[in-house]
Amino acid sequence: MRVLSTVLAAKNKIALGAATMLVSAGSFAAEPNAATNYATEAMDSLKTQAIDLISQTWPVVTTVVVAGLVIRLFKKFSSKAV
C-alpha cells in the first residue's frame, strides 16, 4: 500500500511538472517576437561595440607600426653613418 501511494505521488508530481512546462511553453509561444527581438538587440549592440572598439584601435596600431618602421630605419642609417 505504501509503494502504491509513493507511485501515485510521483505520477502527480510528473503530471504537475508536465502541465507547468506546457503552460510555460504556451505563454512563451504567445509572444513570438519577444525572444527574437532580445536576441537581435543583443547582437546589434555587440556589433556596435565591436565596431567602436575596432575604430578606436586603428590609430594605435598605425602609430605602433610607424614607430617600429622609424626605429628600424634609424638603426639602419645610424649604423651606416658610423
From Swiss-Prot:
Major subcellular location class: virion
Function (record text): Self assembles to form a helical capsid wrapping up the viral genomic DNA. The capsid displays a filamentous structure with a length of 760-1950 nm and a width of 6-8 nm. The virion assembly and budding take place at the host inner membrane.
Cytoplasmic side: 75-82
Domain of life of the organism encoding this protein: Viruses
Name by which UniProt lists this protein: Capsid protein G8P
Annotated TM spans: 55-74
Coiled coil found in the keyword field: no
Native organism: Salmonella phage IKe
UniProt record similarity statement: Belongs to the inovirus capsid protein family.
GO cellular component terms attached to this protein's record: helical viral capsid; host cell membrane; membrane
Membrane topology field: Single-pass type I membrane protein
